Every structure is written in C-alpha cells, then in structure tokens.
Amino acid sequence: SETNATAPQNQLIPVPAGTVIQEKDREDELYGWDNEYGRHISDVSEFKASKHLVSNREFLEFIKDGGYRNQSYWTAEGWQWVQYKKVTAPGFWIQQEDGSYRFRSMLTVIDMPWSWPAETNYLEAKAFCNWKTEKMGLPIRLPSEEEWYRLLDYTQTPDVSDWEKAPGNLNLEDAASSVPVDKYAFKQGFYDVVGNVWQHTETPIRGLPGFQVHPLYDDFSTPTFDTKHNLIKGGSWISTGNEIIRSARYAFRRHFYQHAGFRYIASTAPIETPDDRYEIDPEVTPYCELHYGNEYFGIENYPEKLAQMALNHAQGRPKG
C-alpha cells in the first residue's frame, strides 16, 4: 500500500547564489497580514538543499541512532523540552509493544506512512540536522527564510495568482493528508518546494523594513517579535488562501506542532538572529510592566488594581 511504500533516498542538490527580494506594498491585490508588508533585499550565498523533504523513513534513522537520548544534538531549549515531555519520537508516532510504529492521522490511526514527510516541531528538526552534520561531515542545518525564497525562485515556482492548478499538495486539491515526498516534482530536480507540509526555517520572525502595525489587529505580529517564534514556509496540504501565497509569513514557538516538516541544507553561511525584540521596545516595555508587572514608576499593576477596586465596591452586596 502507499502508506507502506519505501521512501526515496534523499540527496543534496546545489542551489546557486542569488538575490532575493521580499516585498509587498499596500496596493497589493491579495490579502496580507501586517508582517508581510515592506521590502527586504538579501544576497544569498550558494548552498545545497535536500532533494526531498525528510520522510518518516529518513527520520527513523535518527531515532534508531539514539537521537532523542543524545543531548549533544539538541539546543538547550530542545533538550529541556525532551526531558520535560519525555519524548522518544515525533508526536504523531505511536510505538507498539514490538517496537514498531503506527501513525495518528487526522481521523484515525494507520500503518506508518514511511514515504510521507516527517511531521516534527522545530526543535526535533534542528536536532536531526545536527545529527546529520555528524553523519555526513557537512554543515547541515535548516534553511533561513531567505534561503527558502532562493530555492523558490531557483525552481521558478509560480505564485498563487499564476496557478491553473496547485503545483503541489496544497489548497485541498489532492488529499486530506500528506502524500509521498516523491509525488510532486518541481524544476531543478526538487520535490515539494511548496505544499505537503509546512517547512521549518532557522529564522525567527520580525518585521520587514517598512513594517507598520495594522490598527485593526495591532497584536497579530508584534508579540511574536521575541526571537522565540520561528517562521514556517510553503504551506501544507490543508493550507488555503493567504497561507499559500509567496509573501505569507507565519511563525510559531519552536516546540509547537503544525502540519510541518522540513528540508535540510548544507551551508557555511551564518544565520542572522534578530535582536529587535518586542518586549524591549521603549514604548512597549512600560505598557507591559503596567499590565503584567508588580509595580512600575510607583504605579501598581493596573488590571490588578481595577480588580481590587471592583472587589471593594462589591463588599456587602448581595451575591445573586
């Protein structure tokens, strides 16, 4: 059956250097969230990227090699999560008494679909890459957001407005699940450049140059500008609408599970980690302290003070 199919052997394919332009202006005809608007130009060095998304079969090798027991593969955050949750495999894997695995899909438990992309959180994907670095002797990691766009451009993957049909397992046009990682071919020899599952990146979200908070949803993006929310790209089988356009930028905490997997790259280029955190903005910090701290500039916690005033006012009043 398809779920028991043998997964393809993965390999690295070169991606030449190039300039990436991320931009969206206020006149764009497609809907967007505030973090999509602005303009960012980056020169991306050459790298190699895996032909396929990492399949369940490929991820199994990490598990069998003691990946969840070896602290050296994990970031400090990742190892803390492993210890706290006592994790031994991705969240949708169910280990049987004989040591084999089954898979919890959206609606039922099925035989392990070895050829489907491994659905992990960022922490697991990062640990896998560190393990792969040791095994391959190459600087293996997740792509940055800019490197993901460079692969998108190199494979000449069209934006949604130019589709006649979704180029991958997207928009609910194929299946109500993932499909094998070698089903949807793209140019230059790659598969699943978009679709099937979201793809983890190394990049914590921040606003693009020219970013402005939208007044109708002022806390959609800015609370995630804390270096703790990493971008996922490309959409999954169930992604529709804004989620599948080129400019989409969604980010989640690194321990969260989505319909997300990953592609790894080999690159010596450094990863730029933003430090423009929302909580240290001088205009925001007093507001946060006033609402969530104990006292700021001699002013008591505002919501707590209001609650205490309400309780005092209610003293002696009938309960009912």
Language model segments and positions:
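C-terminal, surface-exposed recognition/capping segments
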Residues: 31, 36, 192-210, 216-320
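Functional-site microenvironments in short loops/helix caps that host divalent-cation chemistry
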Residues: 1-37, 42, 52, 67-242
